[in-house]
Amino acid sequence: MKERKYFGTDGVRGLVGEHPINPEFAMKLGWAAGRVLSENGTKKVMIGKDTRISGYMLETALQAGLIAAGIDVVLLGPMPTPAIAYLAQTFRAEAGIVISASHNPYYDNGIKFFNCRGLKLDDKVELEIEAMLDEPMTCVESDKLGKASRLTSADGRYIEFCKSQFPQSLSLEGLKIVLDCANGATYHIAPSVMRELGANIITHACEPNGVNINHECGATHVDTLKRKVLEHNADVGIAYDGDGDRVMMVDHNGRVFDGDDLVYIIACQAAQDDNLGGGVVGTVMSNMGLENALKAKGIEFARSKVGDRYVMELLQQKGWTIGGESSGHVLNLDLISTGDGIISSLQVLAAMVAQNKTLQDLGTGFTKYPMKMINVRYTPGTDPTKAPAVLAAVAEVEQTLGEKGRVLLRKSGTEPVVRVMVEAEQEKLVIDSAEKIAAVVESMSKQTD
């Protein structure tokens, strides 16, 4: 299959104001997507965004391009990414478009698409849109132009949906929860969901101003959350990322529970309820300890490429429902079609309440292997991972580790870095091995400059 030019592992991403994240390209992308998507007959698309200041600009440009292609646009305003997927599905729209750069700083932004089933677009459709971008932009006849409207009930609809995924027989009454919304898209959703289910909520980073999204807060910066959990003697802390599709949690002692931990807890609860529906999908980055812990409980485990779209693909191939990434993307296809930070955290909270256990208690039985990851920048257009010296260094480390460890070398799908990851039972061996491989990768990268 032809390689995509603009679409990466999570849509189109970049620095605001630079190609392709500028008004001109966004309008052309809206038009191209409108032309491709309208071939299916439905002429309605929903657009949502996170809280970045550039969202207004990109939203308007996308809207103009779609309308020029004859597509009706429904504006959702600031909403979590999974909410946009859900609403596009329930409103029978041809697509949901998300304007967000997830956990990245405010000066980055991105555009990604969900189809009418709430799933990310197939590679084939993305290639069709890219091919249409090469065509000159035209406008449909005036009487066939699209229209724009705003769905003012979007937040209320999604709050009720999230609450409906929490067991009717349970309540969060008596739980004190610190909630970090990353000054992002969950700021007006998650607190309402938790409060209406009975929890005592202490909020942090719930006041977006357009430029503070993910700034020293959220799922990628949990130090403040840890401190606040301890300060307030809270039962648990929850941190979402800027667009609400990732989640990290903190127990009452300040220990961080990442995506691997949460997948383990959710899968174990599902197995206990006789509702697992097969095995669990992780990625090549999932900790070896997760695989071993699940297998010890008789739960099959499979690995996909990195990216929640690939976790989804493998889940669908196997007919399973639960999977996720250590970064905090957690999927449960019985509940929603994409990773949802709020719903994933509700599943963990439900397990705490149902079993009358702390988050710490639920994590017993899963011990992570020591892991070291080093990011090495490289020149775009080159591939140091295929250099003979790098392959030799990897082979040497793999021979030393044997079956008690593993090495992963991969290029990021969103930035020009090679990720060097080593896992093993002994921490010193892990660090030494990762640094050894990274040094060779770096030397090869410099040679290609």
UniProtKB/Swiss-Prot annotation:
Keywords: Isomerase, Magnesium, Metal-binding, Phosphoprotein. GO terms for cellular component: cytosol. It catalyses: alpha-D-glucosamine 1-phosphate = D-glucosamine 6-phosphate. It holds the Pfam family PGM_PMM_II. The keyword Transmembrane does not apply. This is Phosphoglucosamine mutase. SUPFAM superfamilies: Phosphoglucomutase, C-terminal domain, Phosphoglucomutase, first 3 domains. The keyword Lipid biosynthesis does not apply. Activated by phosphorylation. Belongs to the phosphohexose mutase family. Transmembrane segments: none annotated. GO terms for molecular function: magnesium ion binding; phosphoglucosamine mutase activity; phosphomannomutase activity. GO terms for biological process: carbohydrate metabolic process; peptidoglycan biosynthetic process; UDP-N-acetylglucosamine biosynthetic process. Binds 1 Mg(2+) ion per subunit. The modification Phosphoserine is found at S102. Its cofactor is Mg(2+). The active site is at S102 (phosphoserine intermediate). Mg(2+) binds at S102, D241, D243, D245. Its EC number is 5.4.2.10. Catalyzes the conversion of glucosamine-6-phosphate to glucosamine-1-phosphate. The gene is glmM. It comes from Pseudoalteromonas translucida (strain TAC 125).
